[in-house]
């Protein structure tokens, strides 16, 4: 197996999870103190200068990312992860607004003045139930109940790295404009970005950029699935299941009837629709008629209005299930997110810059680690050589696969993103292999490539007004005339306790 040997010496060891917030803030101060400033005379162009700045500080960025990897804090509980990123930005001269939109771990960091205003988003929440060491073999860490299986420790840090490089250039060049970093919590089911959009925190932004951990390098104009989710709670009457079942009313029967009718519904929705559920509570003993049961439902579709309609249908099914079992039903909308609105003009600019940056080149040790991880995949998995390649540019109008709260942002401001090979090619998101690679120098290298691509694209936007104009014209055309944004999740408050069962955030 290959593990910690891949880590740069500056990466904080796993003991960093014991640090309190004051110690975490020291990381930000130490990073700023250690930043290597690259004189403009050493660069052949501004983009060379931006790349040199990021390369010169790559070890410090890896330190921050791996500290957040160690913390592995779940949605709306990312206290130390958020504080770490805020500390880095604050010490670099950004003005910080913390706890925005009713979310204690959300923040907006601003540097500069005037227009254009370019935003860049960062995430930092981990996933419960998927923890793993920095090993190429399956190796859960005892006592750790979450892991960065979607690479958000890299996402947040890479976005900050890009912002710091561009901040340095803005200051040196005197270029007008504002860069804004949005710290967006709880992407994994908590829809943190939606509350920022709903509160108008992005209304004055000209363009928004983002990126994501991936097993390939790509920057395309692509969409995603809209998604509305909810918890459906059924209340019955307990009784002895053998002695007097007629006196009871089974909440579990209601859930089963609910799911049965949903499965009948599947025949009558379009092929692009996706409906999935889990029973989060179904009773505790077979000899007791359950008086409470709960089902957690996701409803997805490429069209947000169709997702909304299907969720309403599911709600009526739940009402019918309660009626048929003489139980009572309540439901709570947990989150609702739009599909991503593609923007080809921005995506092509991002793609051009990704092509300049290039793919991820493995060292001999990294290659051995990648081969060991790759051996756990099916025979038809993509070759590990794919990490060094750039995927062809595509325009994907109809969403496929997953969902993201970037969708709501993209319907509010022209938005584009990219993915870089932070994982071994063939890796699925939300897997132990993603956690493992993201904790090594492979993940760090992909993050640095993303930071450079974002920084280059930020430079293009600050210096090319016609690019912003083209992006906005496409944005308006795709939204259609008279468009008014209405959040799928309605007026509910952020579900700050939606991971409450995950005691203590990242570790227990």
Which residue stretches match the model-derived regions?
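Acidic/His- and Gly-rich active-site-bordering loop/insert found
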Residues: 44-148, 153, 157-178
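Bacterial N-terminal signal peptides
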Residues: 30-38
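Sec/Tat signal peptide C-region and signal peptidase I cleavage site
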Residues: 39-43
């Amino acid at each position: 197996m290959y593990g910690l040997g891949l880590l740069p010496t500056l990466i904080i060891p796993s003991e960093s999870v014991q640090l309190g917030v004051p110690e975490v803030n020291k990381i930000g101060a130490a990073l700023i103190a250690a930043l290597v400033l690259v004189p403009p005379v050493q660069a052949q162009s501004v983009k060379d200068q931006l790349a040199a700045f990021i390369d010169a500080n790559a070890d410090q960025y890896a330190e921050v990312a791996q500290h957040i990897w160690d913390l592995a804090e779940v949605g709306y509980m990312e206290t130390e992860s958020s504080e770490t990123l805020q500390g880095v930005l604050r010490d670099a001269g950004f003005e910080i607004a913390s706890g925005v939109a009713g979310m204690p771990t959300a923040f907006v960091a601003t540097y500069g003045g005037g227009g254009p205003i370019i935003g860049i988003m960062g995430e930092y929440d981990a996933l419960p139930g998927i923890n793993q060491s920095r090993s190429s073999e399956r190796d859960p860490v005892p006592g750790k109940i979450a892991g960065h299986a979607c690479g958000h420790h890299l996402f947040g840090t890479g976005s900050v790295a890009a912002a710091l490089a561009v901040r340095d250039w803005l200051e040196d060049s005197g270029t007008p404009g504002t860069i804004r970093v949005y710290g967006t919590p709880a992407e994994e089911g908590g829809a943190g970005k939606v509350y920022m959009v709903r509160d108008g925190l992005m209304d004055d932004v000209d363009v928004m950029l983002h990126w994501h951990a991936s097993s390939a390098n790509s920057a395309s104009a692509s969409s995603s699935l809209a998604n509305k989710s909810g918890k459906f709670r059924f209340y019955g009457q307990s009784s002895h299941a053998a002695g007097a079942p007629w006196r009871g009313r089974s909440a579990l029967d209601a859930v089963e009837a609910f799911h049965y009718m949903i499965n009948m519904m599947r025949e009558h929705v379009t092929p692009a629709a996706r409906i999935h559920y889990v029973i989060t509570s179904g009773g505790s003993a077979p000899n007791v008629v359950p008086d409470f049961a709960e089902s957690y439902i996701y409803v997805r579709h490429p069209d947000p209005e169709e997702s909304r309609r299907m969720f309403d249908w599911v709600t009526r099914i739940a009402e019918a299930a309660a009626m048929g079992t003489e139980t009572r039903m309540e439901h709570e909308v947990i989150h609702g997110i739009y599909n991503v609105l593609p923007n080809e003009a921005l995506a092509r600019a991002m793609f051009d810059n990704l092509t300049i940056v290039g793919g991820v080149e493995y060292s001999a040790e990294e290659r051995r680690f990648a081969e060991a991880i790759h051996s756990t995949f099916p025979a038809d998995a993509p070759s590990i050589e794919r990490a060094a390649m750039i995927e062809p540019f595509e325009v994907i109008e109809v969403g496929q696969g997953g969902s993201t709260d970037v969708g709501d942002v993209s319907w509010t401001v022209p938005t584009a993103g990219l993915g870089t090979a932070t994982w071994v090619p063939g890796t699925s998101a939300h897997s132990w292999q993603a956690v493992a690679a993201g904790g090594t120098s492979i993940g760090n290298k992909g993050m640095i490539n993303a930071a450079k691509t974002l920084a280059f694209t930020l430079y293009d936007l600050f210096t090319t007004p016609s690019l912003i104009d083209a992006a906005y014209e496409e944005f308006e055309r795709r939204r259609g005339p008279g468009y008014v944004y209405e959040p799928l999740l309605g007026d509910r408050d952020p579900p700050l306790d939606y991971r409450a069962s995950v005691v203590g955030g990242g570790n227990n």
